[in-house]
Amino acid sequence: MSSTIFHTVAAAAPAPVSARYSHAVEADGWLHVTGQLPVDPERPDAPLPGDITAQARLCFDNLKRIVSHARYALDDTVFVRIYLRDFDADFAAFNRVYDAYFDDPQRLPSRTTVGVSRLGRDARVEVDIVLFSREKRATASQPHT
């Protein structure tokens, strides 16, 4: 039996402007969410916040908007990948924000954090996630709108 694949662009998240992509792709209970930069969806052309704490919060808030639009919950996250432009300077502060979004020590996703030399819009951080939901898998052929 072939699975249905759904592509999502959430109006509440920053619009894809630098490339063509879906905010998320869903198949068989899995949701792969495209990396999010710290862009304010209400003011997408505004300068990015300067500090890592504000940037990390914006990334996670954007991820939550996309996840919610696809009818998943952040608690369904099984994997997080983080790109930090200044690993040594930003790792600890980023982790404090991360801990606020993933606060149940019994349900922590797997995670990779990578130091990179540059990110789009000169952001300090970008985050992408993968989620899985048994309930969504059971209804995988029913599209969301």
Stretches with model-predicted labels:
Residues M1-D61, R65-V78, L84-T145:
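N-terminal presequence-like segments and the immediate start of the first folded domain
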